[in-house]
Amino acid sequence: MMEGHMLFFLLVVVVQFLTGVLANGLIVVVNAIDLIMWKKMAPLDLLLFCLATSRIILQLCILFAQLGLSCLVRHTLFADNVTFVYIINELSLWFATWLGVFYCAKIATIPHPLFLWLKMRISRLVPWLILASVVYVTVTTFIHSRETSELPKQIFISFFSKNTTRVRPAHATLLSVFVFGLTLPFLIFTVAVLLLLSSLWNHSRQMRTMVGTREPSRHALVSAMLSILSFLILYLSHDMVAVLICTQGLHFGSRTFAFCLLVIGMYPSLHSIVLILGNPKLKRNAKTFIVHCKCCHCARAWVTSRNPRLSDLPVPATHHSANKTSCSEACIMPS
C-alpha cells in the first residue's frame, strides 16, 4: 500500500508532467509550424525548439522514474535506461545554458572587445553550440560506456535495497565526472545570467535618473529581471538536487526525497511557462490556443443543452469575426 505522502507527491508529479508537456509542446509546435511555413528557423527559435524537445523527453523519464520509485512499474526497466536519462538531462542543461548566453549577448551592454565579438556572432554560433553540446555529452558518456551504465544503475537500485552498498571508492572518480558534467554548464550559465542582471540593473538606475522615462518601460525592465532571476533559481535548484541524488545523500521514501523529485520536475515545466510569458510570439499563440479551447467548450456545452443526444458529435471549428468577439460574448446564445 502506497503511503499517503507518496501518493500526494505522485499526483503532483503527474500535474507537473501534464503542465510541462503542454508548455513545451506549444513551443515545439509553434516553432515547427514556422519552420514548415518559412523553411527556416531563427537562432532563438532553434534554441527554444531543442530545449523544449529535450524537456518533453526528460519529463517522460521523470514520470517513469516516479512510477518506478512508487512501485507501480518495475524499477529495473528504468535502471536499465538511466544512462539515457542522464544524457537527456545534461543536454537539456546545456541548451538552457546557451539560451542564457544568447540572452546575455543580445540584451546586455558590456564595453569589452570579447563581449562585443560574441554579440556580433552569437546568432551564427547557435547551431554550432547545439551541435557541440550533443557531441560533447555523447563522447563523454561513451568514453566510460561500461561505468556510465553501471554507476547510475547502482545509484537507482540502491534506493530499493537496504543491503545495497553505496558507491564504491573505485567509482568515486567517475562520480566526480557526473557531477562535473552538471556543474560546467551551470557555471557558464551563472556567469552569463549575472552579467545580464548587472547590465539590466545599471540600465534601470540610469532610467530612474532620466526625466520623462515612461512607466511601461520600467515595468518591462523589472519583468525581464524577474524572469531571468527565476530562470537562475530554477536552474540552481535543479542542479543542486541532481547532485544530491547522485551522491546518494537522500533516504528513499522520505518526504525530503519526494520533495527533491518534485524540484527536478519543477524546473522543465515552470521555466517553460516563464519562457512563454516572456516571448511575445509564444504568448500570443498560447492565448489563441486557450481562447479556441474555451470557445469549443462553450459551443459544445450549448449544443448539448439544446439536444443532449448530440453531446458525442464533434464541434466544427469556429472562426472569429472581424470585430474579434470575445469567447464570453460568443457563448451568449439565444435559448
Swiss-Prot record:
Keyword Transmembrane on this protein?
yes
Q: In which tissues is it expressed?
A: Expressed in subsets of taste receptor cells of the tongue and palate epithelium and exclusively in gustducin-positive cells. Expressed in 15% taste bud cells in circumvallate and foliate papillae but only in 2% in fungiform papillae. Expressed in the gastro and duodenal tissue. Not expressed in colon, liver, heart and kidney.
From which organism does this entry originate? Mus musculus (Mouse)
InterPro entries, per the entry:
TAS2R
Q: Where are the transmembrane segments?
A: 8-28, 44-64, 82-102, 125-145, 177-197, 225-245, 257-277
State the membrane topology: Multi-pass membrane protein
Q: Name one GO molecular function term.
A: bitter taste receptor activity
Instruction: Say if the entry is tagged with keyword rRNA-binding.
Output: no
Extracellular face residues: 1-7, 65-81, 146-176, 246-256
Q: Keywords of this protein's UniProt record, alphabetized?
A: G-protein coupled receptor, Glycoprotein, Membrane, Receptor, Sensory transduction, Taste, Transducer, Transmembrane, Transmembrane helix
Q: What else is known?
A: Several bitter taste receptors are expressed in a single taste receptor cell.
What does the similarity note say? Belongs to the G-protein coupled receptor T2R family.
Name the job this protein performs.
Gustducin-coupled receptor implicated in the perception of bitter compounds in the oral cavity and the gastrointestinal tract. Signals through PLCB2 and the calcium-regulated cation channel TRPM5.
- In this entry, the parts of the chain located on the Cytoplasmic side of the membrane are 29-43, 103-124, 198-224, 278-335
Give the residue range of the signal peptide: none
The protein here is known as: Taste receptor type 2 member 119
**Subcellular location, record wording:** Membrane
Q: Which residues are glycosylated?
A: N81, N163
A cellular component term from Gene Ontology for this protein is: membrane
